[in-house]
From Swiss-Prot:
Name of the molecule in the record: Probable nicotinate-nucleotide adenylyltransferase
InterPro entries: Cyt_trans-like (IPR004821), NadD/NMNAT (IPR005248), Rossmann-like_a/b/a_fold (IPR014729)
Keywords, ordered alphabetically: ATP-binding, NAD, Nucleotide-binding, Nucleotidyltransferase, Pyridine nucleotide biosynthesis, Transferase
Signal peptide annotation: none
Function: Catalyzes the reversible adenylation of nicotinate mononucleotide (NaMN) to nicotinic acid adenine dinucleotide (NaAD).
Enzyme class, broadest EC rank: transferase
Any Pfam family matching the protein: CTP_transf_like
GO biological process: NAD biosynthetic process
Keyword Transferase part of the UniProt annotation: yes
PANTHER family per record: NICOTINATE-NUCLEOTIDE ADENYLYLTRANSFERASE-RELATED, PHOSPHOPANTETHEINE ADENYLYLTRANSFERASE
Length: 216
């Protein structure tokens, strides 16, 4: 099975998360996508909502999307959500499956600042999405890693048959439709009493309004 993994604060989850995940799922013929809320994001400030509230919103979204599932492995953890630890645990749970960890180009450019980033490739492939406003310069130090581990490059240089059974360690660049949406933007609109109906799934907006979340 080919399993995509998209982690994030999801504070709240919105179309800027969902639409790229759907595009990646189709582009790479993934069997399912795990949406994985962080508990203690190492690279971000603490979220505005409780972990339980964010889990509820993501679970609601997954109930509406075919092939999407909630993954609460990080939300249950009492220590920082380091990606390499999470992927190691997920690989132990899915030893025969291919894991595809989804990230944006902005995160990929900061990859060397991640805890034990080199070990990520032991457990999963990386899917690098092209987001609005980011373009990797040919001279950027991450370009060498992107080229050396790109799926297309390894297919060309090592042969298709050899890579057919390689279930981790490659990078899959995927061009996605620009989604200029941010959780900060949504929270600000909600705090002003605006209804960002075009940015959120209806089930998410209903939950936010029923729970009276993000009010000033």
């Amino acid at each position: 099975m080919r399993i995509g993994i998209l982690g994030g604060t999801f504070d709240p989850i919105h179309y800027g998360h969902i639409r790229p995940a759907i595009e990646v799922k189709h582009a790479l013929a993934l069997d399912k996508i795990l949406l994985m809320p962080n508990h203690i994001p190492p690279h971000k400030q603490q979220p505005n909502l409780t972990t339980a509230q964010r889990l509820n919103m993501v679970a609601d979204v997954c109930s509406q999307l075919d092939g999407f599932e909630l993954c609460d492995i990080e939300a249950k953890r009492d220590t920082p959500s380091y990606t390499v630890v999470t992927l190691e645990q997920l690989k132990a749970l899915h030893p025969e499956d291919e894991l595809f960890f989804i990230m944006g180009m902005d995160s990929f450019l900061q990859l060397k600042s991640w805890y034990e980033w080199q070990r990520l490739f032991n457990f999963a492939h990386l899917v690098v999405c092209q987001r609005p406003g980011w373009q990797l310069d040919a001279a950027h130090p991450m370009q060498q890693i992107l080229t050396a581990r790109s799926h297309a490059h390894q297919e060309t240089h090592e042969g298709h048959a050899k890579n057919t059974h390689k279930n981790s360690g490659q990078i899959f660049p995927v061009t996605i439709t620009p989604q200029d949406i941010s959780s900060t933007q949504i929270r600000e609109q909600l705090a002003k009493g605006e209804i960002p109906a075009d940015l959120l799934m209806p089930i998410t907006l209903d939950y936010i309004q029923n729970q009276r979340l993000y009010l000033p």
